[in-house]
C-alpha cells in the first residue's frame, strides 16, 4: 500500500481521529472490494468515508465533518458534503447526488465504506438497494481496506487545514471547495497518463465515442 501512495491518516494525527463506528447497530455488509482498488469502468467501484476538519484552536467547538464519494476509475470526487453533524442525512445527501449523476451502465456499482453507523442505517441501505448498488464494508479497525479515500483525506488536509490557520468555518469550507476543484480538474496523476481525473474521464469518453 505504501508503494501505491495509499496511507492511513491515523499515524500522523495529533488529535483523536473521528470514528463513526458505534458497534453493530444495523446491517453490516461483507467486504466485496477486498482492496481491489483498480477498475477500467467508470462508476463501478466507489469508495466513501467521513473525516473531521478542525480550525483555529482545534477544539471540539471548532470542527466540521467532511464526506466524499470517490470513483476508483479515475480518482474523481463525484459528490461530497461538509457540515457540523455527521448524521445519516449528512451521508444521504451526497449519496443521492451520486445516484443522480450515475450514467446507465451494463454493470452494477459497488460502494465501499467502513462500518460507521451511517452506513449500517436502513435509509442508506435502502437507497443502495433501490438503485441496485452492491454494498461493501471494511473490516473493523482496518483502514487499509479503504486506503484510497483515506489517502485523499490526507492530501485534502495537507492542502487545507495542516498548512493554514483558518479562523472560522466559512474559511475552511471555501478552502475545501477550492481544493476539490483543483484536485478533480488540475491535479495530474501518473497512473492517468499525466491527466487530471476530469481530463481522464473526458478523454476516455471521447475515445469510446
Map each language-model feature to its residues.
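Short small-residue beta-strand/loop micro-motif enriched in glycine and branched aliphatics
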Residues: 74-80, 135-138, 162-163
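C-terminal domain-tail junction helix/linker
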Residues: 129-133, 155-209
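Short, surface-exposed connector motifs at secondary-structure boundaries
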Residues: 76, 104-109
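Basic, flexible linker segments flanking DNA-binding modules
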Residues: 1-41, 198-205
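Mobile genetic element proteins and their domesticated derivatives, centered on retroelements
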Residues: 1, 33, 49, 75, ...
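An active-site-proximal beta-strand-loop segment
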Residues: 35-78
